[in-house]
A protein has these predicted regions:
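Bulky hydrophobic/aromatic packing residues
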Residues: 12, 28, 78-80
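N-terminal capping segment at the start of a domain
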Residues: 1-23
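Catalytic cores of large soluble enzymes that bind and process phosphate-bearing ligands
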Residues: 4, 20-24, 28, 109, ...
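Predominant activation on well-ordered alpha-helical scaffold segments within soluble catalytic domains
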Residues: 9, 13, 30-33, 118-122
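A non-catalytic alpha/beta surface segment that caps or lines the substrate-entry region
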Residues: 21-73
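Short amphipathic alpha-helical segments, especially helix-boundary/capping motifs
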Residues: 5-10, 36, 94-100
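Active-site metal-coordination/substrate-binding segment of hydrolases
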Residues: 55, 62, 73-122
Length: 122
């Protein structure tokens, strides 16, 4: 399988445009849930937001095994990333340079930690 670089860049930029400072990740959580469901992932959100004073819980999901033998014999595989971004995390603008580098416009952080991992996972 090869990676579609243009799609990955578009996805990354879309993720960086979602405001997701710590404790205010609701928009990111909703986006991730929507996209994961589109990919046939069974999606859940826990209730940790209530306990920590945030507005979104942890999102987790799984792809069910397609056959009984796979369900019984395959080892689980975990992919993990976080949704929040350090401040200043709102109104981010990604800039794609001619040499392929992606940076912020200088007024905020880019949010590559951890939107880069989320883009790859999706």
């Amino acid at each position: 399988m090869s990676i579609n670089q243009n799609r990955l860049i578009r996805r990354f930029i879309a993720l960086t445009e979602i405001d997701s400072p710590s404790f205010r990740e609701r928009e990111m959580a909703d986006y991730l849930k929507r996209e994961l469901k589109r990919l046939a992932v069974v999606v859940h959100e826990d209730d940790c937001a209530d306990r920590i004073g945030g507005n979104a819980g942890n999102i987790y999901g799984y792809l069910p095994a397609k056959d009984t033998q796979a369900r019984e014999n395959a080892a689980p595989l975990l992919f993990l990333a976080h949704m929040d971004t350090v401040e200043p995390a709102c109104s981010r603008k990604a800039v794609v340079h001619e040499d392929g580098r992606i940076t912020s416009d200088g007024t905020t952080v880019l949010g590559a930690d951890d939107q880069a991992a989320l883009a790859v996972l999706l």
